[in-house]
A protein has these predicted regions:
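Core beta-strand elements of the Rossmann-like FAD/NAD(P) dinucleotide-binding domain
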Residues: 6-9, 152-162
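N-terminal Rossmann-like FAD-binding beta1-loop-alpha1 element of flavoenzymes
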Residues: 9-36
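Short hydrophobic core segments
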Residues: 12-14, 37, 158-170, 314
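Active-site substrate-recognition segment that forms the wall
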Residues: 22-30, 39, 47-54, 59, ...
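Dinucleotide-binding Rossmann-like beta1-alpha1 core, especially the glycine-rich loop
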Residues: 52-111
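Mid-domain beta-loop-alpha active-site segment that forms a flexible
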Residues: 107-126, 168-170, 244-251, 313
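C-terminal catalytic lobe of FAD-dependent flavoproteins
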Residues: 110-111, 263-344
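A conserved short coil-to-beta-strand element within the FAD-binding core of flavoproteins
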Residues: 133-148
Length: 344
């Protein structure tokens, strides 16, 4: 791999969500010329188009892999946000309070909210990165050390020495015809959030100064509030659902009853907005990061924790590629590795 890096620093990243944008930024900082391609016109058109989301640690009784990785992930996310985003507008290191029924509240100081599209745009605006939208990749072909991307008309879209697939649920489709590539069985999970204008909550005497998490999340930014999200494997429609809007109001009642009372007339009059995205999850709920074969890497399947996982996973990929000291211990690197699918 060292010789491969020495001979060329030209790379394509397929997918312009949080994972793809963070991966592109990590590689570009190390001198790579990165082209990011996506089937959509603007970046962050998939699940990363969420109006606002949380980065926060996941707490488990047994301190499982997800807990350990998320604890490191929030540090990388916060570092990246401080460098690229405008505090109070694009993100806020506000801390997050977790409330779960029958359990004491937990305060997470190293957590907060981020507008994912702002993070994606900021990453793609870095030096050494070129953005190409409306590029629907049909198949990948390796010829020697060169990877070629073809579109639906079998026309060449782009060529490079290295390719990183960060295309969420489409990653499995792109790999299916690549010889010796693993078969990835992702779970597509629909999520709907409900949101509106923040001024509708400002009269609340218990107006929260930080997001509330647990069985859903309630977030307030500089201009809006948001509650969600649903988790649905059976319905993958991108059309908003009234049923899910009702479910989100029930989440709000459980998390922040005072705010729910303030917003009840807004919900009843149908004056709220809804956003729907499709997450990409593995069966073990951990992302996939690593090298499939020379010049072909993957960094995807962030599920509902893209803001917590993606900056860390991007740095892990770059660290593996460049033989750097890694941000995770060997057990956690193995837990995320594509090799867990290569063996099957």
């Amino acid at each position: 791999m060292g010789n491969h890096i020495a001979n060329s620093l030209n790379c394509i990243v397929i997918g312009a969500g949080i994972a793809g944008a963070c991966t592109a930024a990590s590689l570009a900082r190390r001198g790579w010329q990165v082209t990011v391609v996506d089937a959509a016109d603007p970046p962050a058109s998939g699940a990363s188009g969420l109006p606002v989301g949380l980065y926060a640690p996941y707490i488990s009784a047994d301190n499982n892999f997800t807990s350990q990785i998320s604890a490191v992930g929030v540090q990388f996310t916060q570092k990246l946000a401080r460098r690229l985003l405008l505090e109070g507008v694009d993100w806020q290191p506000s801390g997050v309070m977790t409330r779960k029924y029958g359990e004491p509240e937990q305060w997470h100081a190293d957590a907060g909210w981020i507008k994912p599209a702002a993070l994606v745009q900021a990453c793609l605006s870095q030096a050494n990165i070129t953005w190409r939208g409306n590029c629907r990749v049909k198949r990948l072909v390796q010829n020697g050390e060169i990877w070629t991307l073809f579109d639906n008309d079998d026309q060449v879209l782009q060529q490079a020495d290295m390719l990183v697939i960060t295309a969420s649920n489409q990653s499995a489709d792109l790999l299916q015809d690549v010889p010796h590539a693993p078969k990835l069985n992702f779970q597509a999970v629909r999520g709907q959030v409900t949101y509106g204008n923040l001024k509708e909550t400002k009269t609340s005497p218990q107006h929260p100064t930080h997001p509330i998490n647990g069985g859903g999340s309630y977030i307030e930014t500089d201009t809006q509030w948001l509650i969600g999200a649903t988790y649905d494997r059976d319905n993958l429609s991108l059309e908003p659902s009234i049923r899910d809007q009702v479910d989100n109001f029930e989440r709000l009642e459980n998390l922040v009853p005072d705010i729910a009372e303030q917003l009840k007339p807004t919900f009843e009059r149908g004056l709220v907005k809804n956003w729907v995205g499709i997450r990409c999850a593995t069966t073990d709920r951990l992302p996939i990061v690593g090298e499939i074969m020379q010049g072909l890497w993957v960094c995807t399947a962030m599920a509902s924790r893209g803001l917590t996982f993606a900056p860390l996973c991007a740095e892990l990929l770059a660290g593996l590629l460049h033989h750097e000291a890694l941000p995770l211990n060997a057990r956690l690197v193995k837990a995320l590795s594509i090799q867990r699918y290569m063996r099957k």
